[in-house]
Amino acid sequence: MNRDARVETAISHWAPRLISNGVLLADFQEVTGQIQRWEDWCAAWCLRAADHEGLGRASLEDGYHLTAGEHLSRAALYYHFAKFMFVNDVAQMRAAHAKAIECKQLALPHLRPPGERVEIPYCGSYLAGYLRRPSGAARPPIMIMVPGLESAKEEMEAYELPFLSRGMATLLVDGPGQGEAEYEHPIRGDFEVPAAAIVDWVLTRTDVDTTRIGLWGVSMGGYLAPRAAAFEKRVTACIALAGPFDFQDIWDNLPELSRETFRVRSHCATQHEAKAYSAALTLKGELRDRSTVRFSF
């Protein structure tokens, strides 16, 4: 049986990402080695996620809290990668996503440093996030971290650790079209709007330094972060990791899985409509003249 081209694409394009973000190499090889059809991707990863979830829950019962946090975080990551581009079956995708959130919530108090779930008011609803503060810091600077097209806050632990180890707090947030927000709020090119809501919320905290707020984004988040920073004057530094300068310009070169994921998460009916919608995701124009922050690309 020939392997589904979508499975081949997922493996060839995203293997380094999965492994560098915390998927064990043995798990990656065993899980992907048995998947022939894309329709089986989500279920296969959920099965392996359940193994780590079981180990985490058993560790909690036995009082091994650090081990529990590690296993439950890994379970959340695997459930996330089960659903990350599985937009062809929304029911399966949402079920896996719910498990990712559940496992991460269980893990947060047992991480070092521990984390807390936060809900940031936005457009009559909220944006969900995870806040972690380095040990021993009264009011550390804070880095707001923005996921990409098919990523979410449950994937971001490997990215946040360098900031935590250097004395910075981290706030991982699902923006519109991402993670918990993707079902209610579509992707939006004017990310300065949700960014303003996030910064407004940060300013209510007394346990971080609100004069030193950074904004970090990866992949599509590497577009969203500098776009927002060009407008949001309360942000003092920005890191853009591999973001597109103009999303519509790269549309035709994206894998089919990515185009379909963008369609679903922008709440468009067709890919033709989604391509037109993607024109809003651009750094062209006068944005450079608006920015007062320090950038790192």
Q: What are these model-predicted stretches?
A:
Residues 133, 139-148:
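Short beta-strand element of the alpha/beta-hydrolase
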Residues 155, 162, 185-211, 227:
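Alpha/beta-hydrolase active-site loop
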